[in-house]
Amino acid sequence: MATLFIADLHLCVEEPAITAGFLRFLAGEARKADALYILGDLFEAWIGDDDPNPLHRQMAAAIKAVSDSGVPCYFIHGNRDFLLGKRFARESGMTLLPEEKVLELYGRRVLIMHGDTLCTDDAGYQAFRTKVHKPWLQTLFLALPLFVRKRIAVRMRANSKEANSSKSLAIMDVNQNAVVSAMEKHQVQWLIHGHTHRPAVHELIANQQPAFRVVLGAWHTEGSMVKVTADDVELIHFPF
């Protein structure tokens, strides 16, 4: 058996091929797993569990079917869907996890997260992240009428795209010291995350021992998952 990890699908109505690929994944590979972990940015945007977007209901039903089949499903918030709440989690049969979670998998101690907190060189983003994660601000935003939230979300995505266009790729990648610090804080030799859209398996030293950082790919033109078994940790790409 295997435990599966995915991230950065950025589901939206404008990308039906990605949605179709995810549905096939849920109906196939996911049903064979010991567990499925979604490490953030499942959706391109999330303005509240009360958004009647049919895509959200469709995805909730599809994930719930996996959960109901006996495969537990877990979710860590990303930078795009950090407002995804208990209502959607309940509808989809997912368990919400904290932003950093340590798992014991087949004899390995593995830290999982979305990965945006590791990009500490991007001071502008980290300041923005701190602001939008304030509970009072989230409560205020979610109390706004849906049409107002949609307008704000469109403006924020446009601002983010403009800001990122002027940033170097290095700034938007993880900071190595932040990676080592997180792994040593949790006493792990394995880290799995997404966010950067740069799939790879990196070797490093943490806790004065060899360690590994496995980065999930985004679902732009193909699927990406990490498959952990008793024998191996594999980064796998597959067609939609």
From Swiss-Prot:
The keyword Transferase does not apply. Its cofactor is Mn(2+). It catalyses: UDP-2-N,3-O-bis[(3R)-3-hydroxytetradecanoyl]-alpha-D-glucosamine + H2O = 2-N,3-O-bis[(3R)-3-hydroxytetradecanoyl]-alpha-D-glucosaminyl 1-phosphate + UMP + 2 H(+). GO terms for biological process: lipid A biosynthetic process. GO terms for molecular function: manganese ion binding; UDP-2,3-diacylglucosamine hydrolase activity. InterPro entries: Calcineurin-like_PHP_ApaH, LpxH-like, Metallo-depent_PP-like, UDP-diacylglucosamine_Hdrlase. Substrate binds at residues 79-80, 122, 160, 164, 167, 195. Disulfide bonds: none annotated. Its EC number is 3.6.1.54. Hydrolyzes the pyrophosphate bond of UDP-2,3-diacylglucosamine to yield 2,3-diacylglucosamine 1-phosphate (lipid X) and UMP by catalyzing the attack of water at the alpha-P atom. Involved in the biosynthesis of lipid A, a phosphorylated glycolipid that anchors the lipopolysaccharide to the outer membrane of the cell. HAMAP family: LpxH (MF_00575). This is UDP-2,3-diacylglucosamine hydrolase. It comes from Escherichia coli O157:H7.
